[in-house]
Amino acid sequence: MSDSQQSITVLEELFRKLETATSETREGISSELSSFLNGNIIEHDVPEVFFDEFQKAIQSKQKALNTLGAVAYIANETNLSPSVEPYIVATVPSVCSKAGSKDNDVQLAATKALKAIASAVNPVAVKALLPHLIHSLETSNKWKEKVAVLEVISVLVDAAKEQIALRMPELIPVLSESMWDTKKGVKEAATTTITKATETVDNKDIERFIPKLIECIANPNEVPETVHLLGATTFVAEVTPATLSIMVPLLSRGLAERETSIKRKAAVIIDNMCKLVEDPQVVAPFLGKLLPGLKNNFATIADPEAREVTLKALKTLRRVGNVGEDDVLPEISHAGDVSTTLGVIKELLEPEKVAPRFTIVVEYIAAIAANLIDERIIDQQTWFTHVTPYMTIFLHEKTAKEILDDFRKRAVDNIPVGPNFQDEEDEGEDLCNCEFSLAYGAKILLNKTQLRLKRGRRYGLCGPNGAGKSTLMRSIANGQVDGFPTQDECRTVYVEHDIDNTHSDMSVLDFVYSGNVGTKDVITSKLKEFGFSDEMIEMPIASLSGGWKMKLALARAVLKDADILLLDEPTNHLDTVNVEWLVNYLNTCGITSVIVSHDSGFLDKVCQYIIHYEGLKLRKYKGNLSEFVQKCPTAQSYYELGASDLEFQFPTPGYLEGVKTKQKAIVKVSNMTFQYPGTTKPQVSDVTFQCSLSSRIAVIGPNGAGKSTLINVLTGELLPTSGEVYTHENCRIAYIKQHAFAHIESHLDKTPSEYIQWRFQTGEDRETMDRANRQINENDAEAMNKIFKIEGTPRRVAGIHSRRKFKNTYEYECSFLLGENIGMKSERWVPMMSVDNAWLPRGELIESHSKMVAEIDMKEALASGQFRALTRKEIELHCAMLGLDSELVSHSRIRGLSGGQKVKLVLAACTWQRPHLIVLDEPTNYLDRDSLGALSKALKAFEGGVIIITHSAEFTKNLTDEVWAVKDGKMTPSGHNWVAGQGAGPRIEKKEEEGDKFDAMGNKINSGKKKSKLSSAELRKKKKERMKKKKEMGDEYVSSDEDF
């Protein structure tokens, strides 16, 4: 008897024993059968007949239990034989059907067998196994079968995590449907399985939101909130099929929501995520769900701005998915389809005349190959490792490898290939060759881009304003760029002229020496090389100009033995001579440099390469700036001189009645002293100052000197212990605290637009309503008991209701309480009727009712139409002046804003009411260099007064004229030009507001032109016409305003 015939005989005997086995002998026979099958059976003699009988036994009621136990044993074998694996996977549909059996023992045995198969199968053969499980979920009406299959999928996720990640687009819809099953057990199992499956989503941007995304599948009411949460997310990680499979259900529902804001936010997320898709084939399966929703919204949304955002997302989706304007969806690649690879392998095997009994094995090989194509694994050795063991079942190894290599090449040729930009080859030592992504706040700057720097080369870093050039430089210097060499491997120094103010009193030599860069002799020698004289080396840093500070920073970097210099706008503070010196130095020092500059002439003279921002990538061009512009003409506009990355603008202050010049005091403090209760001495004492629209004041002094206390009294946050504080009735002060975020900390879940609407919804600034100068205290209550003698009766003021002009001041309409039996035990005060209201002059009221008068002044100012409407568009326009775009203002929650964006929001909110004075407490603490430059320019151009508390002389040097030096509670002013009356200078005329005017509630104010007075001749003419009409019409005549 031959070996093969003997094997078949043994199998038949074992199978017969298995059929008749009892519960006591079942395990032993199953184990023996498993060992024999996975042993040394001749590959060409695959026991086809045995497995046919095996399949029938699984379906049999009498034999199922024993056979399922054997399946588990065969699959649990440590080394599952390649000749057995395809056949054992082929039993899965039959085993699945038994997992729903009413017989509990059979159901448990089937579940155990399925889990054993899922654990044992080659991970790359997942495309052979998973379709069976999905088909069972889709077609079965047995809830136990569904629960078992869901548990098996969880096991398969652990066994083949990378492969399941690629199958998520077909897996998630089926699991989602199971989550809506009517059976509670299926729902729970589906939720557990989909949670397990999402472990394959390797995307740091969304991983913390995955529980919410799963919750949205089960509960669609959660969609709006989840879209809001994701809308504040910065997407920087590559978007894969697994990521889209879990995101697209949410986004497609978001596009179909009723609220326009949710539709818009969903479009923003689609736009941001699609930019991170590397391969059009990744997004292709999802185009059918996203494209129609975006098109429909673009056609039906009424809000123009939301339609514009939707159109932007639509364009991005079309570009990434290679969709034409006709919106015909491109064909999805079938390179990784099992049917495609099966066709190729069958064609190659045709000359070998492979027997029909190996069909299951050939189909299994096609499934493995399809998975390798999906994973984009194309190297020969990996294909040999995964596929050869199955090919040698019916071919000799040499023939198998020859056919397999041909199979690999033909299968790989079917993969669609996108454009590939190779870095220009260049000889030299690599200092850096890394791939990374970069974001700032909620904005993606770079996505999976390469940066390669060679020793001794000079690179110009170029891109449009806001592309993130300085952010990239700072990120490299701070070690935040993935893959960039550490300081131990490659010393990188960020050269900036803004030397920290804490070192301003140190000498130049001591400052460089404090950086541990060498001995003082070495440092002195190097500084002299850079042009420093002996006298300058001993000078304090504060006395150096910006240009010399730049040279000092460069000398310190060179002494640190830098391999790479990062230069951010190095020519900003240099004169022509020093620019030429810097050009010569960089060209001859041999140090690699990366330069950001708007000086095109400087870049032309220095750079050997231009690194340019293109579509979230860095692309390198050989040559200087002129050569680069020839290759990329559209880049010319980026590098015009004077280009500014950031600009702020403050609104023009409202008109102040009685203030004819900018020199007239609008805030005046005389002999003011303030002492906190319980302290032994005043915090500030005997302080006198005044502020006008032309004030540019720097408040300086050591910590604890009383600067902030002084400002708090000025702004009304605190009331003085003694002294006088006068503020113009309609003067508005914007105060940005040292801890700027204090203004918005309790509103993080609002959008910036909603925050501003909340803050000013009554017309008043709700942030200032708790200021001490607006709260009625005990002294105020006592003063308000003052008795006025009016029309012979004693009265107390009950309320103040309106204001009108009276000579050079104002008078106020007051309601009263009438006094009866004053001074007696039966004394009482009775409210009087409104007909008894009377007008009292301001000077008389202010002594006892100053805070009530201030409230009326505020309300009158609000009614004057000097405030804009609290509409979304108006708020967006205002915030745009402070560098916040409409996307952030109306559609992003404050919680998701970066630190710099939050500060801009605080600036925007504080200046909403067009303040006359802007007070900033330590702005350099919370604004970066770019924003400080923009703020400095805006404050210079501001038409109101500016008061700044700061330690930074650099910031205030060219901005302020007046200095208040605070020390030990005393304030010494200098540079001031205080005047008693209106003062000199050009007169301020009240300007007529252009365009429509609104009150604080958004109601349009119709301000008609004032009628001119008629002359006596015109009046006589009007009278004659009136008499003529009366005579002609008789009793029918009715006069009108036009007749007079």
Swiss-Prot record:
Annotated protein name in UniProt: Elongation factor 3B
Residues found modified as Phosphothreonine: 972
Principal subcellular localisation of the protein: cytoplasm
Enzyme nomenclature, EC number: 3.6.4.-
Domain ABC transporter, chain residue ranges per copy: 426-641, 667-993
Catalytic function, reaction form: ATP + H2O = ADP + phosphate + H(+)
GO CC annotations on file: cytosolic ribosome
GO BP annotations listed: cellular response to oxidative stress; cytoplasmic translational elongation; translational elongation
Repeat positions for HEAT: 5-42, 86-123, 124-162, 166-203, 205-241, 242-279, 285-323
Alphabetical list of InterPro entries matching this protein: AAA+_ATPase, ABC_transporter-like_ATP-bd, ABC_transporter-like_CS, ABCF_EF3_subfamily, ARM-like, ARM-type_fold, eEF3_ABC2_chromodomain-like, eEF3_chromodomain-like_sf
Annotated pathway: Protein biosynthesis; polypeptide chain elongation
Description of how the protein assembles with itself and partners: Monomer.
Note: Present with 125 molecules/cell in log phase SD medium.
